[in-house]
């Protein structure tokens, strides 16, 4: 299963210079796995882009509605917060901070990676430097393979 962090998922909804590369990654097949936290994180990201005038007025809510429809349609698979995800999140935090080169993982990033593990992901798509560094410690494949 491929888990999509919000930093990468947002590029599928808002045109950015590298959006096409992420669209190609998304077409590899299967539903894109996301965390239940992503449903809120993406709304914040969309509103932030609207505030910065990267989106037209009202664009954030229109895109968010499309995002919710994709969840309903099964294009996006939401990993719920469960005891399993909580346990994996604890493991993520401990492994990141005790690594030879520790990663100062933040709470929401740890919850995202705990969701990835709890959902059975073996790959993470992200542009976030901390999530990418943590995914490496956790032996998850990281996409895209070009640097950010």
Question: Which residues make up each language-model segment?
Answer:
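Short active-site oxyanion
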Residues: 29-32, 75-77, 118-123
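An acidic intrinsically disordered interaction segment
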Residues: 1-14, 70-85
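Short beta-strand scaffold positions
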Residues: 33-34, 80, 107, 126
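Short, well-structured N-terminal submotif of metal-dependent ribonuclease cores
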Residues: 1-63, 129, 138-143
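Acidic catalytic patch
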Residues: 72-100, 108-110
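Helix-adjacent hinge/juxtasegments
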Residues: 52-82
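Acidic, PIN/NYN-like endoribonuclease modules and their adjacent C-terminal/linker elements
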Residues: 1, 101, 113-148
């Amino acid at each position: 299963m491929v888990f999509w962090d919000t930093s990468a998922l947002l590029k599928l909804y808002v045109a950015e210079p590298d959006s096409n590369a992420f669209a190609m990654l998304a077409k590899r097949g299967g539903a894109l796995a996301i965390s239940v936290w992503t449903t809120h994180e993406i709304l914040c990201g969309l509103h932030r882009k609207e505030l910065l005038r990267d989106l037209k007025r009202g664009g954030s809510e229109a895109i968010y509605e499309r995002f919710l429809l994709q969840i309903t349609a099964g294009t996006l698979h939401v990993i719920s917060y469960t005891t399993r995800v909580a346990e994996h999140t604890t493991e993520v935090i401990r492994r990141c901070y005790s690594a030879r080169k520790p990663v100062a993982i933040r709470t929401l990033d740890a919850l995202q990676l705990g969701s990835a593990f709890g959902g059975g992901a073996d790959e993470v798509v992200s542009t976030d430097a901390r999530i990418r560094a943590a995914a490496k410690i956790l032996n998850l494949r990281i996409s895209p393979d070009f640097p950010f």
